[in-house]
Amino acid sequence: MNSSGGSCSSLMDVVAYDHHLHHGHDEELHVLAVDDNLIDRKLVERLLKISCCKVTTAENALRALEYLGLGDQNQHIDALTCNVMKVSLIITDYCMPGMTGFELLKKVKESSNLREVPVVIMSSENIPTRINKCLASGAQMFMQKPLKLADVEKLKCHLMNCRS
């Protein structure tokens, strides 16, 4: 797990708005980026830093669930509350060993604490049935890998359109 911050001049407006409504103050936005491929994970982290103030990375869905407080049932409730309150967006690869991004999406949407957090699924494969399954299960968006800066802008515009 890795967290890093940076300065932002243009934040994802809708995520910032939702974050402000839920938390009542202007703290850094927090994106959880999940990908088993180190290069893809670093690329996503770099692109998100351009639009977001803070990015936490996880190398697989199980580590992401642990971070979110959904992994180990014995995890202390304070850690769960702390991390849930800070995550504004989850972006995850679809194909990962152990647990897929789709399974992570389902776990997040089943959680009463996390179901409102937007989840974006990424994949290098453009399979319409997979895309439709993810969107029908609550994914905010499905994006083709490798991500580019234009994709981050597309995500921003999509989230803004969903708000209105």
UniProtKB/Swiss-Prot annotation:
Induction: By cytokinin (BA) in roots. The keyword Transcription regulation applies. It is found in: Nucleus. GO terms for cellular component: nucleus. Transmembrane segments: none annotated. Keywords: Cytokinin signaling pathway, Nucleus, Phosphoprotein, Transcription, Transcription regulation, Two-component regulatory system. Its main location: nucleus. The modification 4-aspartylphosphate is found at residue 93. The keyword Nucleus applies. Residues 30-160 form the Response regulatory domain. Two-component system major event consists of a His-to-Asp phosphorelay between a sensor histidine kinase (HK) and a response regulator (RR). In plants, the His-to-Asp phosphorelay involves an additional intermediate named Histidine-containing phosphotransfer protein (HPt). This multistep phosphorelay consists of a His-Asp-His-Asp sequential transfer of a phosphate group between first a His and an Asp of the HK protein, followed by the transfer to a conserved His of the HPt protein and finally the transfer to an Asp in the receiver domain of the RR protein. Signal peptide: none annotated. InterPro entries: ARR-like, CheY-like_superfamily, Sig_transdc_resp-reg_receiver. It comes from the Eukaryota. GO terms for biological process: cytokinin-activated signaling pathway; phosphorelay signal transduction system. SUPFAM superfamilies: CheY-like. Belongs to the ARR family. Type-A subfamily. This is Two-component response regulator ARR16. It comes from Arabidopsis thaliana. The gene is ARR16.
